[in-house]
Each structure stands twice: as structure tokens, then as C-alpha cells.
Design a protein with these regions (language model features):
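N-terminal nucleophile
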Residues: 1-155
Length: 155
């Protein structure tokens, strides 16, 4: 969770109480935040690079990143207990399986841009079919969010 006004953000999960996040880039896969899996390291580094580029092309750069299907080298794979073949299958940022029963089903971006005292937030989601092809895109924009004068309760 977080607070756009103060810039404070927290991470929590079913295994960890809310913990304040340091400023910077954080990445998440199916484990703890910033778990040093190859795809998490790749996402973190590429996101930092993407944020330094042209803002107008940011969403497309990020969707390209989320669509990467490179398999990590065996020596870099985590040992999560599913066996080496499954680790290989799960190692790309974008996962597809031969039978199409498991894999990436959507890629979602939440982009924020400060607009005076408020923010313009854009949520863009691409849905993928069983083969991994994009089948739909949805966009929702929140202009001037939160509304000027609104301050969340602070404990």
C-alpha cells in the first residue's frame, strides 16, 4: 500500500507484516518482494532503465519487458522444489506452457504522473490467451486523483 501525497509505501503479504519500502525500484514475482530470481533482477534493472527514457514511450517499453520469454540459465534458477524442468518453464518474465493450462494471463501497468497537487493515474492491462497472444487491452485513467483537498487519515 502507499500514500501518493507523502510518498511513503509499504509491502505486506500473507507471510509478512507491513514493512516500509525504501525509495527506488522494487520487483515482484511469485515469492517475496525483490526475491533475487533471474526474472526479478531483470525486471528491476530494466525498469530503472525504462524510467530514464522517453515518458511518451514508457508504457510500450514496459509491456515489451513484461512480454520477455527468455529462459534463465540452469545455474541461475531458484530451487523452489518444483524440479529443474518446471523451474525452466517458470523462469521467463512472461510464462507460457505447452498445454496452455498455466501461464501469464494478463500484464498490468499502473502509471502515475504528478499534476500539481494531485496525480494522473493510468491503469493499462493487456489480457493474453492460452498461447500468450494479446487478446484485449483495457485502459482506465484517473485524472486529478485523489481529488484536491482530500487527505487520507494518518494513524
Amino acid at each position: 500500500g502507499g500514500d501518493l501525497h507523502s510518498g511513503r509505501w509499504w509491502w505486506c503479504s500473507d507471510r509478512q507484516a507491513a514493512t516500509p519500502l525504501a525509495s527506488g525500484v522494487h520487483a515482484l514475482s511469485n515469492a517475496a518482494l525483490n526475491e533475487p530470481w533471474p526474472k526479478v533482477r531483470r525486471l528491476s534493472a530494466a525498469l530503472e532503465e525504462a524510467l530514464r527514457g522517453d515518458a511518451a514511450a514508457l508504457a510500450e517499453r514496459l509491456f515489451t519487458l513484461l512480454g520477455e520469454r527468455d529462459v534463465a540459465a540452469d545455474a541461475d534458477l531458484p530451487a523452489t522444489g518444483v524440479g529443474i524442468e518446471r523451474e525452466r518453464l517458470l523462469s521467463p518474465i512472461f510464462i507460457t506452457t505447452p498445454d496452455g493450462r498455466y501461464g501469464t494471463r494478463c500484464s498490468t501497468l499502473v502509471l502515475g504522473e504528478r499534476d500539481g497537487q494531485s496525480w494522473r493515474l493510468q491503469v493499462i492491462e493487456r489480457t493474453h490467451d492460452r498461447r500468450g497472444d494479446s487478446s484485449a487491452e483495457r485502459r482506465v485513467t484517473f485524472d486529478r486523483w485523489p481529488q484536491p483537498g482530500h487527505r487520507p487519515a494518518v494513524n
